[in-house]
Each structure stands twice: as C-alpha cells, then as structure tokens.
Amino acid sequence: MSVGTVLLTALLALVGYLLMKWRSTMRHWQDLGIPCEEPHILMGSMKGVRTARSFNEIWTSYYNKFRGSGPFAGFYWFRRPAVFVLETSLAKQILIKEFNKFTDRGFFHNPEDDPLSGQLFLLDGQKWRTMRNKLSSTFTSGKMKYMFPTVVKVANEFTDVFGQNVAKSPVVEVRELLARFTTDVIGTCAFGIECSSLKDPDAEFREMGRRSLTEQRLGPVGIGFVNSFPNLARRLHMKMTAEPIERFFMRIVRETVAFREQNNIRRNDFMDQLIDLKNKPLMVSQSGESVNLTIEEIAAQAFVFFAAGFETSSTTMGFALYELAQNQDIQNRVRKECQEVIEKCNGELNYESMKDLVYLDQVVSETLRLYTVLPVLNRECLEDYEVPGHPKYVIKKGMPVLIPCGAMHRDEKLYANPNTFNPDNFSPERVKERDSVEWLPFGDGPRNCIGMRFGQMQARIGLALLIKDFKFSVCEKTTIPMTYNKEMFLIASNSGIYLKAERV
C-alpha cells in the first residue's frame, strides 16, 4: 500500500471521526429524550441571532414553547449542549441553594490578552471570589451615601438640559438624553471626570459608551467559536474588546490613577476605592493570590461599571417613561409622591428621603419586570447535578445553564396579566408573598449584581427630578408596541423612545 493511500485513509478516518463526534454533540438532548429544538450545525439553538432574531426573542420563544414540559429544556449554546431552565424552583437551586456547583457564568474572557475582559462580571472560580471580596466594600450603603450628592448634582444639570430641549420641541427622544445623563454620572463616580455629554452629545465618553455596546472585535461566527471552544480561543490569544475601546479606557484609567496619586486627591468615589485596593499593604489570600489590584484590573472594573451602569439605568428609565406616558393615572400618582417628598426636603433630594419614594420604587421594579435589561442569567455547571425529583434530568459538568428571567417575568403563572404595566405588582404586601427568584433583574444569590444599589439609586434620582417637573405623553412618533434592537445582548429599543414632554 502506498504512502499516499495510507495518508488518505487516515485523513478520511479522521474526518469521519470528527463528523461522528460533531453529530453526537449536536444530538445530546435528542438521544436522552429531553425536549429541545433541532440545532443549527454551527449556531446551535442561536440560529438567526443578531440578524433575524434578537437574543431576547430567542429566550422568549424557547421558554414559551417548552414551559411545562419539565424542569428544563435542552438547548445548544452554539455548539455546546446547554440547559434552558423552565422552572423557578430549579433557578433557585442553581442561583442560591446549590450555588457552589454553579458559581461560574461561563462567558469567554481572556485577561492576559484582553485586559478589559478581566472584569468581575466575566471572571470565574477563585479569581471571581477574590475580586468580589475586593470590591464588596465599594457598594455599601455608606459608599452610596458618599456618592449621592454627586448623582443629584448631575441630575439637576440633566433636568436643566431636558427643559432646554423641551423648550425647542415638545417631542423628545428620551433614550439618548437619559444615556447622556447616566454617562455623566458614571463618568464622574467611576473616573472622577467631567464627561460633559449632557452639554455635548458627541463628547468622547459618550461616544466610547455607544461604541462599547455596539462594536465588537468578532462577528457572529467568531463569537460562536470563542463560546464553543474557550480554551482553544485563549491559546490562540483571541480577544473580544475592540482595540479603540481598550486603548481609550486603559489610557483614561492610567491618567486618572496617576493624577490622583501624584496630587493626593480624594473624591470618595468608586475610583478611590479601586486605588485603595491597589495601594493597600501587600496581602495574599488563602489561595495564594495577591489581593492588591493591578492597573489592568482597575481598568477592567471601571470599564464594566461604566459600560453596564450607564446603559442599564438609562434603558430602565426610558422604558419607565414610555409606560408612564401610556398610563397617566400612574404617572400622576408617582408625580404627586415625588413632589411631596422633595418639598419636605426643602426642594433638594437627600439620601434619607429616598426611602419615602415608595411608589416610584414600585414603578422602577415593574419596569424591570416588563423590560428586563439583562433578560437571561448564564451559569456553568461545575459538577454533575441531578435535578431533585427528576432523575432523567442531569446537568453535566461543564454545561452552560441559561435562566430566561425576562421570559419568566411575563409568565401568567407568576404575574396576573403579565404584559400589563402594574406597579401594584410590587406593593410591600405582594413582595412579601413572592419568592425572590420570581423577580431577577439583578440575579439572586452570591453572584447577584454587585452594583444593584447604585443602579437603582441613579435611576430613582433621575426619574424623581424629571417626573416632578415634566408631564410625559405619547405622540405620533412613539412606537407602540415597542420594537427591540436585534444586535444587542441587552434589551434596547430599536429606534429610540419618542415622547411628548411639557412642564407641569
């Protein structure tokens, strides 16, 4: 037999083996008899994402198709067999009771080559635990109280700019203005920098904020590859963050840290907390890792605080105004509360008065239910797990787990008339009756959103000052029903939120 024949035979055998391996991977759930859709050969259950369908449309349609069929449905996270949770009882096991078996999110990250991916949201294992412990002190109620006046100052500037826009035209695209408000808040608190995006919509920070959410180094195929073969992608030094965004945030952080250290400047903000963690006397954790932050780690945490903080809060505020514009009775009730609370504070919100904005808090909570900005929670199984009472349903080690919280929030078994905006869903009485995992805009358990307090604070301050002085209603340009951006992982309106605004 010739060498060529041997090589050809070996090649064909290898190809045959790979095809069989490929097929067996994409038949995992079907062979076990677990309900699932037939996967696409490359995209798995994510077929059409960012082109024909948004991420949330995939989660919602999958949930509605399979709910009631068992504790979870089979899913294919690109080429990886994954678990798609259908019951809140299983969500509670994963997020809280069996958290140690589902600690990691399982998203691709590569801090060695892509420093901004070394952020708390993406880190796994001991690296996540160490970083979470480092940052836990930065979002205490005491730290929120320190940052409160800064947020109010920017919010007052925001209402002035908003009023100027209304004076020019009563029809306002609120999404962009709200994003400029939260950009200035986060820029000030995270970097100590006057971003000035309220005055200049093309300010550098605002531009980079936009790009950080829409620009990616990889296309759909590349994203599918790094999520299907994360270890290989790291060995190939693959990166997710676009080069201009990495350069900008690394430069800003280096300059900010150097300026504060050289001039002994203290601002009692998020950046100060990170600098303290960088400069504290060298300590080593029980696992042997340094508990001092590097400049790259500071940049990564500041970046995620900025990118996630401005977008999630501004999106929530925009959808709140969108619903209030369609529900004038609710808007009048929340305005009355805001006016009374602020009047008691001699016209200036203070930290202690925020607890009195009870109905506004219900409005924000209901907005987060209907428009869950992060509509799916991702975890990765760290050891084989049999679902209690369902021996057929086993989550294998290494499997991605998806909890479609946005779809669950619109399940009539959890909320009566689930597509109707009703802040009374979050009255104190109903909240007490409800299991915590039935409302998951910030996740739950040890890996819930560390910035939850800050996000809620800036949204409530901004909304309170806006609603106090302005009435919102729908106009010809208002999109009803809402249409969503197909390219973003987060929930976002497709073409802005146009409302009519007038002073009261």
Swiss-Prot record:
PROSITE patterns xrefs: CYTOCHROME_P450 (PS00086)
Keyword Ribosomal protein listed: no
Enzyme class (EC, first level): oxidoreductase
Keyword Manganese applies: no
Molecular-function annotations in GO: heme binding; iron ion binding; monooxygenase activity; oxidoreductase activity, acting on paired donors, with incorporation or reduction of molecular oxygen
Gene3D superfamilies: Cytochrome P450
E.C. designation(s): 1.14.-.-
Positions bound to heme: 449
Required cofactor names: heme
CDD domains: CYP6-like
Location relative to the cell: Endoplasmic reticulum membrane; Microsome membrane
Protein name: Probable cytochrome P450 6a21
Gene coding for it: Cyp6a21
